[in-house]
Amino acid sequence: MTEFIPPGSLFHALSSPFAMKRGGQLHHARIAYETWGRLNASATNAILIMPGLSPNAHAAHHDSNAEPGWWESMLGPGKPIDTDRWFVICVNSLGSCKGSTGPASYNPITQAMYRLDFPALSIEDGANSAIEVVHALGIKQLASLIGNSMGGMTALAILLLHPDIARSHINISGSAQALPFSIAIRSLQREAIRLDPHWRQGDYDDTHYPESGLRIARKLGVITYRSALEWDGRFGRVRLDSDQTNDTPFGLEFQIENYLESHAHRFVHTFDPNCYLYLSRSMDWFDVAEYANGDILAGLARIRIQRALAIGSHTDILFPIQQQQQIAEGLRRGGTHATFLGLDSPQGHDAFLVDIARFGPPVKEFLDEL
């Protein structure tokens, strides 16, 4: 498979060699990013958005790409992240397949795809690469750093590794470390990919592609991204119409099964399996406690920013709400004016993407007060 790069992407050439936290280095690597709004003369109105595992840098439409982005309702003129006021940057994570260098990219030294020769990937690598983009744009300090899901982890790594890089922070459905439940789910996702006979130790192609493994991995993910409450409301126990079923033993029968199948089928043609493995494992490894002798609150207290907001959904089972509470508590211990907000959204972990009616107002209020 090839990379899936949105039109209108911008690229930053990383320092070469680019050292990786867990060993190894990249040569002539790049980070894909997109921007909205205008940077003011003093370069003090910049906001950096760090996305989750699967999104690209196309958070919203712009002149070079009119397609709606994955955070279209949150970002733009007059929206909660108001691009009439803010210069907004969104990067595609290092290790992804959406424009930034990752396992699906070609190694300039060997002229072959990295595949499993790509160095072990950490959240900190994504943090360091993103800040190179910020500095290249002439920005010394961000007005705010926003991270959601995996991006919430990356944002915390940025704040730990690059003191004074931001005046404020919004952490949305993020965490300071992976919990056992989340690690277990991601372990099953990776196993589904690796056990697909077409995976071939990462050496697949379009003819022999681990579609079944990636499809199952995505289904597991989607189940954890939403909540049982939402599934009940949307699908109940409604069965498919007779023309939607087939005679396959134990095949699709319920609408929820068909939804998962359709969602997964779309995903496998837009994401590289090896990239999925690398990014997934990087989340398992991340732990703020490593920065304070095993004390996660002390690790968070090492972060020095003026203001912070941690937001979560009460129905999130992948990044449960106590993890956002923990972020706010740890930041307060370090002297940050940090606020925690738990929202009653039925849409689980994905609520920040789809429930803008609940998540938008607190983001807008926080940024308006800066």
Curated annotation (Swiss-Prot):
For this protein, the Enzyme Commission number is 2.3.1.-
- Which Pfam families does this entry report, sorted A to Z? Abhydrolase_1
Task: Cite the InterPro entries for this sequence.
Answer: AB_hydrolase_1, AB_hydrolase_fold, HAT_MetX-like
Region Important for substrate specificity: start and end of each range? 52-55
- Site (Important for acyl-CoA specificity) at 186
Q: In which pathway does it act?
A: Amino-acid biosynthesis; L-cysteine biosynthesis; L-cysteine from L-serine: step 1/2
Q: Mind naming one GO cellular-component term on file for this protein?
A: cytoplasm
* Name by which UniProt lists this protein: Serine O-succinyltransferase
Per the UniProt entry, what species is this protein from, by scientific name? Xylella fastidiosa (strain M12)
Q: Which gene encodes it?
A: metX
